[in-house]
Amino acid sequence: GANNGSMEFDRFTEQAGFTGYFGRNEYGNDKDFDGNWGIFDEPFLKWTANKMSTLPAPFYSEIFTISSHHPFTVPKQHIGKFPKGQIPMLEVVAYGDYALRKFFEEAKKQESKEFDGINI
């Protein structure tokens, strides 16, 4: 869900021969923008699971999540939901785990059998 152009992932995917790149611009809903890096993990991963279910098989996909990057913010609706620990990053790592779990729940709902090949 990163801003298009972040770390030049969009340019790399094109140069590497990939046929598509999906980032903040393609997501198209800035109400989920974190104010810094891009789209918060939970909504972007849900959107990604739905998007992946429409891709022709076989396909290869990589996902770059943003929440574990400074300034370590979680969406307003999740503030106080995750343990903070002694370092700021712990709260966003817990949020990232939550978002990833929601991604797999969404992926299981899809009819595509391509989700059987997900690796982390």
What are these regions (language model features)?
Residues G1-I120:
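Solvent-exposed soluble domains appended to multi-pass membrane proteins
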